[in-house]
Amino acid sequence: MNITIHSGNWEELDVDALAVPLAKGSTVDAALDARLGGLPGELIDTGEFTGKAGACSLIHRVPDSAVKRVFLIGLGEAPMARHWFAAAGQAVRAAAKAKCRSVALLLPPDACARLAAEGAGFGQHRPSGYKEQKPWPVEEVILLTTGDQSIADAGRITAECVNLARELVEI
């Protein structure tokens, strides 16, 4: 799985899904909400999405957008570094379940990009046991934040090494 950092706008990208992590009690950026047809704000207003850690809501067919799906990922009440790690892993697993080839994860500038890259890499791990597995559908994760590509590479490499160790232990 390829993990990259992109500092531009998500609309510039050709991705199957966009993951938007949100803290409990927060609202979606007004411009982003308007661009997504007001659907994220509606999910929050109706209480269908609360922002609770581990929460995930899926929006299908965003109007006038190349993005097919938008995932709202809950960060909990006071997001810390570990929450960005968990949100990235959850976004990758949700994208895989929806059979998306690529997913962009919207991160604020103060988020830890390396932990998000590690979380995305950990999110693709599946215990293999002795059975043959279907190919992993997610090929690309794009972290929408500022930073150098070496940060994402370090997180990806760490996740690959840990996942390899997990596989060796399972044998």
Where do the protein language model's features map onto the residues?
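Short amphipathic alpha-helical segment within the helicase RecA-like ATPase core
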Residues: 1-171
